[in-house]
Amino acid sequence: TDILAANPKLDAFGIMGGWPLFGAPQPYRDLFGPLKDRIASNDFVVGAADTIGDEVAIARDGLVTALVGQRPFEMGYKAPSVMIDLVEGKAVADPVFTGLDECTKDTVDTCIQK
Protein backbone atom coordinates (compact mmCIF):
# COMPACT_ATOMS: atom_id res chain seq x y z
CA THR A 1 0.00 0.00 0.00
CA ASP A 2 2.83 2.39 0.86
CA ILE A 3 4.53 1.83 -2.50
CA LEU A 4 1.31 2.40 -4.42
CA ALA A 5 0.43 5.51 -2.40
CA ALA A 6 3.91 6.97 -2.78
CA ASN A 7 4.00 6.29 -6.52
CA PRO A 8 0.58 7.13 -8.00
CA LYS A 9 1.94 6.90 -11.57
CA LEU A 10 3.22 3.37 -11.03
CA ASP A 11 2.02 1.15 -13.89
CA ALA A 12 3.75 -2.16 -13.21
CA PHE A 13 4.64 -4.36 -10.28
CA GLY A 14 6.98 -7.35 -10.41
CA ILE A 15 6.78 -9.91 -7.62
CA MET A 16 9.92 -12.03 -7.63
CA GLY A 17 8.52 -14.88 -5.59
CA GLY A 18 5.08 -16.29 -5.13
CA TRP A 19 4.78 -15.83 -1.37
CA PRO A 20 2.70 -12.61 -1.49
CA LEU A 21 0.06 -14.49 -3.49
CA PHE A 22 0.09 -17.93 -1.91
CA GLY A 23 1.38 -16.93 1.53
CA ALA A 24 -1.03 -14.06 2.08
CA PRO A 25 -3.73 -14.28 -0.59
CA GLN A 26 -6.34 -12.15 1.18
CA PRO A 27 -4.05 -9.15 1.82
CA TYR A 28 -2.94 -9.44 -1.82
CA ARG A 29 -6.57 -9.40 -2.94
CA ASP A 30 -7.29 -6.44 -0.67
CA LEU A 31 -4.34 -4.49 -2.09
CA PHE A 32 -4.83 -5.22 -5.79
CA GLY A 33 -8.62 -5.59 -5.86
CA PRO A 34 -9.13 -1.84 -6.36
CA LEU A 35 -6.78 -2.06 -9.39
CA LYS A 36 -8.66 -4.91 -11.08
CA ASP A 37 -9.99 -2.74 -13.92
CA ARG A 38 -6.53 -1.28 -14.56
CA ILE A 39 -5.04 -4.79 -14.54
CA ALA A 40 -7.71 -6.02 -16.97
CA SER A 41 -6.95 -3.18 -19.39
CA ASN A 42 -3.16 -3.64 -19.01
CA ASP A 43 -2.96 -0.10 -17.67
CA PHE A 44 -1.37 -1.69 -14.59
CA VAL A 45 0.66 -4.87 -15.08
CA VAL A 46 1.46 -7.36 -12.32
CA GLY A 47 3.87 -10.21 -12.98
CA ALA A 48 4.60 -12.86 -10.37
CA ALA A 49 6.67 -16.00 -9.99
CA ASP A 50 5.20 -19.45 -9.37
CA THR A 51 1.96 -21.11 -10.36
CA ILE A 52 0.77 -22.88 -7.22
CA GLY A 53 -2.14 -22.71 -4.82
CA ASP A 54 -3.97 -19.44 -4.55
CA GLU A 55 -1.88 -17.85 -7.29
CA VAL A 56 -3.85 -19.66 -9.96
CA ALA A 57 -7.15 -18.56 -8.40
CA ILE A 58 -5.86 -14.98 -8.20
CA ALA A 59 -4.94 -15.12 -11.90
CA ARG A 60 -8.38 -16.54 -12.70
CA ASP A 61 -9.90 -13.58 -10.85
CA GLY A 62 -7.89 -11.14 -12.96
CA LEU A 63 -5.76 -9.75 -10.13
CA VAL A 64 -2.42 -10.61 -11.74
CA THR A 65 -1.42 -10.15 -15.37
CA ALA A 66 0.93 -13.11 -15.69
CA LEU A 67 2.44 -15.91 -13.65
CA VAL A 68 5.62 -17.77 -14.55
CA GLY A 69 6.10 -20.97 -12.60
CA GLN A 70 8.67 -23.67 -12.24
CA ARG A 71 7.66 -27.30 -12.55
CA PRO A 72 8.53 -28.96 -9.24
CA PHE A 73 7.16 -32.33 -10.37
CA GLU A 74 9.56 -32.32 -13.33
CA MET A 75 12.44 -31.31 -11.07
CA GLY A 76 11.75 -34.19 -8.71
CA TYR A 77 11.17 -36.62 -11.56
CA LYS A 78 14.37 -35.79 -13.45
CA ALA A 79 16.72 -35.31 -10.48
CA PRO A 80 17.33 -39.01 -9.67
CA SER A 81 18.14 -39.97 -13.26
CA VAL A 82 20.47 -37.00 -13.64
CA MET A 83 22.23 -37.92 -10.39
CA ILE A 84 22.59 -41.55 -11.51
CA ASP A 85 24.04 -40.40 -14.83
CA LEU A 86 26.54 -38.18 -13.00
CA VAL A 87 27.55 -41.02 -10.66
CA GLU A 88 28.04 -43.28 -13.68
CA GLY A 89 30.20 -40.65 -15.38
CA LYS A 90 27.73 -39.94 -18.17
CA ALA A 91 27.31 -36.50 -19.69
CA VAL A 92 24.25 -34.55 -18.62
CA ALA A 93 22.72 -31.39 -19.99
CA ASP A 94 23.83 -28.19 -18.28
CA PRO A 95 21.46 -26.79 -17.31
CA VAL A 96 18.75 -29.42 -17.08
CA PHE A 97 15.67 -27.52 -18.22
CA THR A 98 12.43 -28.70 -16.68
CA GLY A 99 10.18 -26.16 -18.34
CA LEU A 100 8.12 -23.23 -17.16
CA ASP A 101 4.40 -22.65 -16.93
CA GLU A 102 3.22 -19.27 -18.18
CA CYS A 103 -0.27 -18.33 -17.04
CA THR A 104 -2.59 -15.43 -17.68
CA LYS A 105 -6.26 -14.98 -16.85
CA ASP A 106 -7.10 -16.29 -20.31
CA THR A 107 -4.94 -19.44 -20.06
CA VAL A 108 -5.22 -20.24 -16.36
CA ASP A 109 -7.31 -23.37 -16.89
CA THR A 110 -4.84 -24.92 -19.34
CA CYS A 111 -1.43 -23.39 -18.64
CA ILE A 112 -0.11 -25.66 -15.91
CA GLN A 113 1.82 -28.69 -17.08
CA LYS A 114 2.97 -31.63 -14.99
What are these language model-derived features?
Residues 1-114:
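A residue-level marker of the well-folded mature domains of exported/periplasmic proteins
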